[in-house]
């Protein structure tokens, strides 16, 4: 059985918790996109784990995989492995596999990301972790892959090939180009390459073989549908495709092998950073939901903007992902709120739409038809 799990909103829907609950029934859990710009929190007993790269199934018996659609900061991966091992969770190459084709985030990606965001007249709210620039290099065929990181000669040769252009880019943006060939940073990356050599695998081969053997495989997304680089609220989006279809493309699994696509949906809606949020609650009520729901980013610590449930937004996510099931989270956060409200229809220039159109283009001209529920005092 092959199951894909994605967030149906703007991320932070509770995917980590649901994946962790379901993972006991799966043999393999794979992450298929994003980087350490998104995180999820998993609680086991009294222990709280904040993850940014390693899939949630690491705490159970599943084999966990990081696919080639991910952009990976090897330093962050090393920190997560160290965190687990301090808590007695062994993360060896039998437990974790990283695809050889996975692009790595270099220090110059982080530098370029920060410089670019600082130069924008309108900020897009990037986490400045180099994610976007790593994806730019992937598309431009200027990436450094895990297969090269774990091979000293190939890594140094590839870096030398790319360095002149990266130095020019950083200098042109007012940064210090010496970061590209910094000896201490290069030494550290070579050490990380040695550490991860045993983890290298072919994720597509592993997943297809597992499915052929009748095993259960779960593909886990980061972020949410409406942050998708193509279908999201551009330019306030992430740098990768967050919808279910990209799981097949990024993991190298044919779409006819998909059995279930599960939507993770929060009973209200949140968004981190900039971008449209039609049902946003400004003021005391929004702050109350933010506090009750613990709506602060795992990665950045930034407070999340909160709003009422948005049905047209969800219907668009259903169309984009082809969901077979929906998991509703954080309904308890709304306990005691009276009345509860939700957006049912988006009205644009006198025409009603029950499914979201182009949110960024239409949000300035849209009015929401809200439904009120008086059951907020009930659990």
Curated annotation (Swiss-Prot):
Residues that hold IMP according to the record: 12-15, 37-40, 127, 141, 223, 238, 302
Gene Ontology BP, a term: IMP metabolic process
Catalytic activities: IMP + L-aspartate + GTP = N(6)-(1,2-dicarboxyethyl)-AMP + GDP + phosphate + 2 H(+)
Cofactor note: Binds 1 Mg(2+) ion per subunit.
EC number: 6.3.4.4
Top-level division of the source organism's lineage: Archaea
Ligand binding (substrate): 298-304
Cellular component per GO, a single term: cytoplasm
Subcellular location: Cytoplasm
Primary enzyme class: ligase
Cofactors: Mg(2+)
Pathway: Purine metabolism; AMP biosynthesis via de novo pathway; AMP from IMP: step 1/2
Residue sites binding Mg(2+) per the record: 12, 39
Entry-linked CDD domains: AdSS
Pfam family, one: Adenylsucc_synt
Major place of residence: cytoplasm
Function: Plays an important role in the de novo pathway of purine nucleotide biosynthesis. Catalyzes the first committed step in the biosynthesis of AMP from IMP.
Record HAMAP family: Adenylosucc_synth (MF_00011)
Assembly: Homodimer.
Protein family: Belongs to the adenylosuccinate synthetase family.
Name listed for the protein in its UniProt record: Adenylosuccinate synthetase
């Amino acid at each position: 059985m092959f199951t894909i799990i994605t967030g149906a909103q703007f991320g932070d829907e509770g995917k980590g918790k649901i994946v962790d609950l379901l993972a006991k029934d799966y043999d393999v859990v794979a992450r298929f996109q994003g980087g350490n710009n998104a995180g999820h929190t998993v609680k086991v007993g009294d222990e709280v784990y904040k993850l940014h790269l390693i899939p949630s199934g690491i705490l159970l018996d599943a084999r966990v995989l990081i696919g080639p659609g991910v952009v990976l900061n090897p330093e962050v991966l090393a920190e997560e492995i160290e965190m687990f091992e301090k808590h007695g969770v062994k993360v060896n190459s039998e437990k974790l596999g990283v695809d050889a084709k996975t692009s790595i985030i270099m220090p110059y990606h982080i530098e370029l990301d920060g410089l670019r965001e600082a130069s924008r007249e309108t900020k897009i709210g990037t986490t400045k972790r180099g994610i976007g620039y790593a994806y730019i290099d992937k598309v431009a065929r200027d990436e450094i892959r895990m297969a090269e990181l774990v091979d000293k000669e190939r890594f140094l040769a590839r870096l030398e090939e790319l360095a002149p252009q990266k130095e020019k880019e950083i200098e042109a943006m007012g940064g210090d180009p010496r970061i590209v060939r910094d000896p201490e940073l290069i030494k550290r990356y070579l050490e990380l390459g040695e550490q991860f050599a045993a983890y290298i695998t072919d994720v597509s081969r592993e997943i297809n073989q597992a499915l052929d053997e009748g095993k259960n495989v779960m593909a886990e997304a980061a972020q949410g549908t409406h942050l998708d680089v193509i279908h999201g609220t551009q330019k306030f989006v992430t740098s990768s495709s967050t919808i279910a279809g990209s799981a097949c493309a990024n993991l190298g699994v044919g779409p006819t092998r998909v059995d279930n696509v599960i939507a993770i949906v929060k009973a209200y809606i949140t968004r981190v950073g900039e971008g449209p949020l039609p049902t946003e609650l400004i003021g005391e009520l929004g702050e109350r939901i933010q506090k009750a729901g613990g709506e602060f980013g795992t990665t950045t610590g930034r407070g999340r903007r909160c709003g009422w449930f948005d049905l047209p937004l969800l219907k668009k996510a259903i169309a984009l992902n082809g969901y077979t099931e929906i998991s509703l989270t954080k309904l308890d956060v709304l306990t005691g709120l009276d009345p509860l409200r939700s957006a049912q229809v988006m009205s644009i220039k006198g025409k009603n739409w029950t499914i979201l159109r182009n949110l960024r283009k239409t949000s300035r001209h849209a009015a929401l038809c809200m439904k009120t529920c008086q059951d907020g005092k009930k659990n």
